[in-house]
Structures are given as C-alpha cells and as structure tokens.
C-alpha cells in the first residue's frame, strides 16, 4: 500500500472497471477504501481480515466496542453470514433490500472473522448503489462504516471523507455528492419483539407494515394483559393491612 491516497472519479461508468480492480488490490493489502453508498459515503475494508478491520476502526478513531456493519452484494449472501434468521427478518430483507435498512442477526459461528465486540451478531445490509454493489460483487462482503472520524458529521462527498480521513485511506471512489446525511435504519432481529436500534432513512411505519409489533428506538415492550390481570388478582388476594 502506498503512502499517498488514490482518488478515482467513478461517476463515469467507463472508469468503474479500473476502479474496482484498484480497490481489489487495496483490500487484498488490508487497506481501506472510501466508497459511495445509497446513504452517505462509507469507509470499507475486507470483512474477513481482522487487521483490515482494525485499520478501519483506527482510521475512524473508534474502539472495538463499536463494530462496523457488513455490506453484501445481494440477499443470497445473508445465509452464509447469519444463521437462525427469523422469517420476519427475511421479510424485511425481501422488502427493503437493496436499500437503507441494516439488520442485526446472529452471526454464523463458523466464520473466521473479527469485527470487534459483536457478541455473536452481525449487522448486514445490501446498499442500493451501483458502484458499491459492483465492488461488493467483485470482492465479497466488506466491513463498512460511515466515512468520518467518530463524532464528526458523515461525509456526503468523497472530498468530505478525504478531509477527515486523509491518508489513512488508500483509495477514494468519488461518485458525486449524496443527497442526505441520513444513515440507514438499524433493526435488531436477535430480540423478541424486533427493535429499532437506530432510526434512519427507512420510516418506522413502513417497517411496521412488514413487522407490526416492531418496537421503535427506545420503546419498551408493552406489559402483556395477562400479566397485569395476574398482578391485580394477587393484590386482591393479599389480606388488608391492619392499622397499628
């Protein structure tokens, strides 16, 4: 990996093939690539290289307690990276992928990767961006986080990303400005009922059209009616307190 970052304009489709080839070289060398997505620009690395993931986290100034999501080229890849996927999670993927929805699932225990302190989970997404998906088809799953230093605004241009990340990234793919700083919506599918871990681009009402009992970000599950009734019955059965 060189000490000087490459910057390639991929807004011209004719440049994409060479850009993807260069990205493959960088990723094989355990380096990081800034790439466009359908939300904001992301910083990506080989998901199966612990060293590359460590480089990504260091570039962002982030610890292992905040592991990056994994972007995949299409929904079929999910079966190889996650297991015991609930039917409702499959339904969310079918409805919103490719798109701005990230699903937290149980990670396949046989995978030899180290994304950080994931507690046996993996956050997966299929981006709705032609450049990102072309790259993912070529190189496989990538650990990808927003292309910014932790605590700073997400980058909506490749230049924004370069101003924050500099030469900690070996290659910048410039596909023009993104329209919004809104991140993807994250849904935790490892809990019952499912819970929105981060509200983003996909609205809650659209998610609930697929999973009606989905909990909003910060919302607590309702107490079941039978539990309330049982508590009332128990209270009624207790003898009345006597006056002293």
For each feature predicted by the language model, list its residue ranges:
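Active-site-adjacent structural elements in enzyme catalytic cores
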Residues: 1-244
